[in-house]
Amino acid sequence: MVKRVRFEAPLIHLIDEAVGRIKEHIRERTILHDLFFRERLEYPTFAWQEALFNAVAHRDYSITGACIEVWMFDDRVQVRSPGLPPPPVTLEQLQLHKSIHFSRNPLIVRVLADLGYLREMGEGIPRMFQEMEHYGLRPPEFSTEGFFFVVTLRNTPVYDDDTLRWLNQFASKEINFRQRRLLAFAYCHGKTFSTTEYERVAEVDRDTAYRDIRALIKSGIVAPLKPKSRSYRIIERL
């Protein structure tokens, strides 16, 4: 551990101070986008702030002598909150991007939502996954250690630099994280894919796969290999 900082303040001031200090330690990275090198933060801002705000909103305040902790490493950020997920919330639900409509501290949640710190109930966790996916990073990890609930964000890329550069050609298109994952898969497999492969890679049912593929066709990103085919090819920009 290089440095340890402790904050004690009313909740709103505590959040603002913690956000400011964390920002100081999140590095910028240089990426290639549309033939230009640009600076980008190593973690999406929404993801780590949502983890912090959720910790403040949902920690178990009956546990005394334990604080919310933010640990920053070279390869990851961890937000550790006293109190295990309260029933009916489970780690499995969180890891499956489920929208959770439950709060241990409803009054605190309402105040933080009114002040703009929290999203609508149930929106934050799915968007954390989307933001990490959009950055080409591994999905958020949820775990428990003793009586702490732990959220881990890693800065390790899911895709290699070549794949990320290729995906950048679709940056102006409205594609979701499932479609982005599928495009990366297709890039590494001859730039073609089938409906069955989409279901497996994106971990969705056939109806969702069909809707996503139709949206990609409508956007001019993919096209059937043959009329009425369930296999598709990527249409690249010139």
Identify the residue ranges that each predicted region occupies.
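C-terminal regulatory or interaction extensions
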Residues: 1-238
